[in-house]
Amino acid sequence: MSKIAIIGMSGLFPGSSTLEQFWNNLIEAKDLTGLATEEDFGQSPSIFFEDGKGVVDKCYSTRGGYIRDFHFEPGGYALDADYLSKQDKLYQWSLHVAKEALAHSGYLKDETARKNCGLVLGNLSFPTGSSHKLLSRIYSHTLEQSVRKLLGNSEITIPGHVKEMPDNRVLDHTPSELVAKALSLGKTHYALDAACATSLYAIKLHPVRNAFYQGLRL
């Protein structure tokens, strides 16, 4: 196996916006898990919670590792700041971490190096808050018809979410494409879903000599 030099790192974790914070939290053995909030679930977590496994359409735990109080700064990229500010947090996290890794490596402002750099992004292709909202009108319409028939009232309406940006609908390749464009990376870029083994696949399948390896787990 060929040798790979790690020349830049960054990270964004629950309770840790930098690698230094992450390391200190590990040393101090901090438990940075917490209970889900309405912001995480889109509704009160109590609606979905049921104490006990096996209950249909319910979860038996709302505890997890949630990123809190992260503010994405959309400036300093090769794409419009207003456009980036409207992207799903999945994309914004990827942009932030990639930019910080480039800065840590010393190549953020090196245009030639970035043109010869690619990106391999590990991404679990689960629905995001934004992608769900794009389809909410379909769900609402279906439920609406059933409720109208059940109650015998054709005037009942169930509102859907406000329209989301269409770019937020694609979950597999779009994050890597957006990061590559925003940071002007000129070589091959792609995302793959291999859960915890994603980083191993990325190292094995790296398309260019200089590449990012990002693992994004939600």
What is the meaning of each model-derived region?
Residues M1-L84, Y91, L95, S131-K149:
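ACP-dependent fatty acid/polyketide chain-elongation machinery
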